[in-house]
Curated annotation (Swiss-Prot):
The lineage of its organism: Bacteria, Bacillati, Bacillota, Clostridia, Eubacteriales. Keywords: Cytoplasm, GTP-binding, Hydrolase, Magnesium, Metal-binding, Nucleotide-binding. This is GTPase Obg. GTP binds at residues 165-172, 190-194, 212-215, 282-285, 312-314. Residues 159-331 form the OBG-type G domain.
Length: 424
C-alpha cells in the first residue's frame, strides 16, 4: 500500500539526574563531594533509507520515544548517555511541526538526517557545586526534560520527469514500456491509485527517473478526485511529459484536456504551470485521420509548446524519440532543492528556564520552569543549600525585579510550596 502522509508523536530522552555523593577520606569534610553528572538523553533522529518508498510503517506505529540518560553516581562517575532513536523514512520526506505547521526539514538526499527532538542535558552532580566556602554541597541538579512534539511526515516523490494527463490516456502503459516498473494497467479510469516510479535506461542517453502521477482531473487543485493528494508529487519533477489521448475514441477533446490539466497546475502552483513540458499525443496507432494530430499540434505550438510528439505506447511508436528528447532537455534543467522560506521554516525554541512574578497583595508569587528546576535541586531546610538558593535568586535577577516591583520589608515571597519573608 502506498502511504504518503503520516502524523506521529516523538519524544527524546530526559537527561539523567546528577548525583549527591561523598567519598570517605580522612580530614575531608563529610568525605568530600564526588557525585557525578547525569547522562544526556537520547535524540530522536529521522534518517533517509533509499530502500523505503512509502510511509506505511507509520500507520501502525505512532509513538517514538528515545532512551533516558542514566543518573550520575559516586566516585565522580557520569551516567551513560541514552541511546539515540533512529527512524527510517523514504527519500523525499518533508517533516513539519504539527503545532506550527512549519517545515522542519526536507530530506531529499541519500544520507540526509534530522534531529526532530533533542535529548535533555544531564544534571550536574554535587561535586560541580563545590566552592571555597561551600565544601560539602548536599544537592545536585536534576536532568533536563526531553523535547516532545507531534510531527507530520509528507512524502513528495523524487523523480526527474513526471507523466501528466487525464485518467486512461496511457501514462501507466508508457511507464511500463520505458522502464522495468510494473504498474497496474487496464482500460478503465483511475486504474492507478498511487504514483509509480521507474528508471529509464536507453542506450546512448543519460538514465533518469520517471513517475506516473495519477488522479489529476478537472478540479484537482480543489481536491476533486484524487486531486491534491497527487498534485504535490509533481513539485519535485524538473520536466513534465503531458500525455493526451489523440485518438478521441472516448469522445474526449485532446486540446481541451491539455488546457484543463494546465489550468489545474496553475491553480495549484504557478511554478508547476511554468515547468517545461513535452507533449505526447498517445494512441496514435488508433488515429483514423492524421489531420487531427496536425490540428492539435498547431494549437499547442501557438501556446508556446514546441515539443510535440506523436506516439503509441502500446506499439512503441515514437517512444524512444520521446525519451531521448526528455533526456536532452534534462541536461539543461538544473536540479534544485525545495526552497523553504523564512516564514515557513521551523525555528526550535531555545531551552531556557524562565520565570514570572505576580503580585497578590503583600505576596509575590514567583513561578515558571526556573522555579521548578531550582526547587527540585535543593533542600530548602538545609542552611547551606538555602544560602545557595538565595544566591541563585540574586544572580538570576529575581531579587532585583522584586525590588523594582516595590517589595517591602516583611512581604512574602512564594515559590511553589516554599515561601519566605523578605527582609531588607
Amino acid at each position: 500500500m502506498f502511504v504518503d502522509r503520516a502524523e506521529v508523536f516523538v519524544k527524546s530522552g530526559s537527561g539523567g539526574n546528577g548525583s549527591v555523593s561523598f567519598r570517605r577520606e580522612k580530614y575531608v569534610p563529610r568525605g568530600g563531594p564526588d557525585g557525578g553528572d547525569g547522562g544526556k538523553g537520547g535524540d530522536v533522529i529521522l534518517v533517509v533509507d533509499p530502500e523505503i518508498t512509502t510511509l506505511l510503517d507509520f500507520s501502525y506505529k505512532k509513538k517514538y520515544v528515545a532512551e533516558k540518560g542514566e543518573n550520575g553516581s559516586g566516585s565522580k562517575c557520569f551516567g551513560k548517555n541514552g541511546e539515540n532513536l533512529y527512524i527510517k523514512v523514504p527519500l523525499g520526506t518533508v517533516i513539519r511541526d504539527v503545532d506550527t505547521n512549519k517545515i522542519m526539514a526536507d530530506l531529499s538526499h541519500i544520507g540526509d538526517k534530522y534531529i526532530v527532538a533533542k535529548g535533555g542535558k544531564g544534571g550536574r552532580g554535587n561535586v560541580r557545586f563545590t566552592t571555597a566556602v561551600r565544601q560539602a554541597p548536599d544537592f545536585a541538579e536534576p536532568g533536563m526534560p526531553g523535547e516532545e512534539r507531534y510531527i507530520s511526515l509528507e512524502l513528495k516523490i523524487l523523480a526527474d520527469v513526471g507523466l501528466l494527463g487525464f485518467p486512461n490516456v496511457g501514462k501507466s502503459t508508457l511507464l511500463s514500456v520505458v522502464t522495468k516498473a510494473a504498474p497496474k494497467i487496464a482500460n478503465y479510469h483511475f486504474t492507478t491509485l498511487s504514483p509509480n516510479l521507474g528508471v529509464v535506461n536507453i542506450p546512448g542517453i543519460q538514465s533518469f527517473v520517471i513517475a506516473d502521477i495519477p488522479g489529476i482531473i478537472e478540479g484537482a487543485a480543489e481536491g476533486v478526485g484524487l486531486g491534491i493528494d497527487f498534485l504535490r508529487h509533481i513539485e519535485r519533477t524538473r520536466l513534465l511529459i503531458h500525455i493526451v489521448d489523440i485518438s478521441g475514441l472516448e469522445g474526449r477533446d485532446p486540446f481541451g484536456d491539455f488546457i484543463k490539466i494546465n489550468e489545474e497546475l496553475k491553480k495549484y502552483d504557478v511554478k508547476l504551470w511554468d515547468r517545461p513540458q513535452i507533449i505526447a499525443a498517445n494512441k496514435a496507432d488508433m488515429l483514423y485521420d492524421d489531420s487531427i494530430f496536425q490540428d492539435f499540434k498547431k494549437k499547442v505550438e501557438n501556446l508556446g509548446y514546441n515539443k510535440v510528439f506523436k506516439i503509441s505506447a502500446a506499439t512503441r511508436q515514437g517512444v524512444e524519440e520521446l525519451m531521448k528528447e526528455a533526456a536532452a532537455m534534462l541536461t539543461n534543467i538544473p536540479v534544485t532543492d525545495m526552497h523553504i522560506s523564512e516564514e515557513d521554516k521551523f525555528i526550535p525554541e531555545e531551552k531556557r528556564f524562565t520565570y514570572e512574578i505576580e503580585k497578590q497583595g503583600n505576596v509575590y508569587v514567583v513561578k515558571g520552569s526556573f522555579v521548578d528546576r531550582l526547587l527540585a535541586s535543593i533542600n530548602v531546610n538545609d542552611a547551606n543549600e538555602l544560602r545557595y538558593f538565595h544566591k541563585v535568586l540574586q544572580n538570576k535577577g529575581v531579587m532585583k525585579q522584586l525590588i523594582d516591583m516595590g517589595i517591602k520589608d516583611g512581604d512574602v515571597v512564594r515559590l511553589n510550596d516554599f515561601e519566605f519573608d523578605y527582609i531588607l
